[in-house]
Curated annotation (Swiss-Prot):
Name of this protein: Metallothionein A
Keywords attached to this entry: Metal-binding, Metal-thiolate cluster
SUPFAM superfamilies registered for this protein in UniProt: Metallothionein
InterPro entries (UniProt xref): Metalthion_dom_sf, Metalthion_dom_sf_vert, Metalthion_vert, Metalthion_vert_metal_BS
Single GO MF annotation: metal ion binding
PANTHER family in the cross-refs: METALLOTHIONEIN (PTHR23299), METALLOTHIONEIN-1X (PTHR23299:SF24)
Family according to the record: Belongs to the metallothionein superfamily. Type 1 family.
Residues annotated for a divalent metal cation 1 binding in this entry: 4, 6, 20, 23
UniProt-listed PROSITE patterns: METALLOTHIONEIN_VRT
Native source species: Carassius cuvieri (Japanese white crucian carp)
Region (Beta): 1-28
Known role: Metallothioneins have a high content of cysteine residues that bind various heavy metals.
Binding site for a divalent metal cation 2: 6, 12, 14, 25
Length: 60
């Protein structure tokens, strides 16, 4: 399943190290947010969260 397959509204807090905005997710993959940051259409495979958000390198 595409990790970005979720509504782009509301917050997404995946544990203590992964926080995304503009999405509506409740779970998080080990190496990547289960949702995309605003303006990101698709997460790159194998991307990792940097700090408290998914870095732009996560997007493709």
């Amino acid at each position: 399943m595409d990790p970005c397959d979720c509504a782009k509204t509301g917050p997404c807090n995946c544990g203590a190290t992964c926080k995304c905005t503009n999405c509506q997710c409740t779970t998080c993959k080990k190496s990547c947010c289960s949702c995309c940051p605003s303006g990101c259409s698709k997460c790159a495979s194998g991307c990792v969260c940097k700090g408290n958000s998914c870095g732009s390198s996560c997007c493709q």
